């Protein structure tokens, strides 16, 4: 958050940490629930219990809901990584540049990946780790949670259906609200999961969603699987960003250049081509993050992605 006063940063924080809004986070969780392998499903159901209907869907917004509890003030910075780039002309994520203090979503995913399978922790602590993973893997797909410009778009005033909002809120919930028009998160997620299973465009892309592909890397790193990424991390016992979440952050950040920051000043962003492109991006990202969350938990509890 360079060149932003402390007061402004604090005033913007509430908007900054609510990626996708409750509906989007629920949808990510419900998509993931549809692809869980047996052991992962058993852990999720047991860990979340009746309070969350034994499902990642209702648990998805939890990490935003607890922000009103000052005991969790420390978690605010873990919902995003401030990519110091220049959209729409240049987009990039650099771990050393953008997470230099070690307090960002990339290290948070690493930490809670370790904690969710730590048998020395209590059931409650493992459950909390699961809820954070549910939420942070969802957050990672929201392009403005991988962007520093104007406090992740919070300072950029825009319009949606004639109403004033900011770019971050528009991408969190404004466009989703218009798209769903009263439809539930569970129903929306069911549709997205069907697209992944149906043999259509999503199905043809899904295997690529859970790789750690980086065309600029050496062949050995480019071919690193999600399973290898997680197990190498767990064996090292070092809390550092994993390869796959870093590549997924770069993926989300790329939409800041191709879509998010392509708006025209003064135009209503919930109409026309901008809205159409945003809907395609949001649905794709929610589907991706749900599928990735399932793959992540499947590796941890079933030994492989099983997808």
Where are the language model's segments positioned?
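Fungal secretory targeting signals
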Residues: 1-19
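N-terminal, motif-rich segments that launch catalysis or mediate targeting to/interaction with membranes
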Residues: 17-136, 143-268, 273, 278-307
């Amino acid at each position: 958050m360079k060149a932003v006063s402390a007061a402004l940063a604090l005033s913007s924080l509430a908007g900054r940490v609510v990626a996708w809004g409750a509906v989007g986070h629920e949808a990510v969780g419900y998509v993931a629930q549809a692809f869980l392998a047996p052991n992962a499903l058993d852990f999720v159901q047991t860990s979340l219990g009746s309070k969350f209907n034994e499902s990642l869907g209702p648990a998805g917004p939890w990490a935003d809901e607890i922000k009103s509890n000052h005991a969790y003030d420390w978690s605010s910075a873990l919902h995003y990584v401030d990519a110091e780039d220049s959209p729409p002309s240049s987009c990039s994520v650099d771990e050393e540049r953008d997470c230099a203090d070690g307090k960002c979503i990339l290290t948070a995913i690493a930490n809670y990946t370790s904690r969710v399978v730590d048998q020395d922790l209590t059931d409650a602590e493992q459950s909390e780790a699961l809820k954070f993973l549910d939420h942070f893997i969802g957050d990672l797909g929201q392009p403005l949670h991988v962007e520093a410009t104007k406090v992740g778009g919070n300072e950029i005033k825009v319009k949606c259906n004639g109403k004033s909002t900011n770019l971050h809120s528009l991408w969190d919930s404004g466009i989703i609200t218009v798209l769903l028009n009263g439809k539930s998160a569970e129903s929306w997620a069911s549709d997205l999961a069907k697209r992944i299973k149906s043999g259509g465009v999503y199905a043809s892309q899904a295997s690529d969603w859970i790789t750690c592909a980086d065309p600029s890397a050496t062949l050995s790193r480019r071919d690193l699987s999600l399973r290898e990424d997680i197990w190498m991390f767990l064996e090292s016992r070092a809390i550092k960003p994993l390869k796959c979440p870093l590549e997924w952050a770069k993926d989300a950040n790329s939409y800041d250049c191709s879509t998010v920051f392509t708006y025209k000043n003064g135009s209503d962003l919930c109409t026309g081509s901008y809205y159409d492109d945003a809907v395609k991006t949001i649905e794709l990202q929610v589907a991706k993050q749900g599928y990735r969350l399932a793959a992540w938990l499947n590796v941890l509890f079933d030994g492989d992605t099983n997808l």
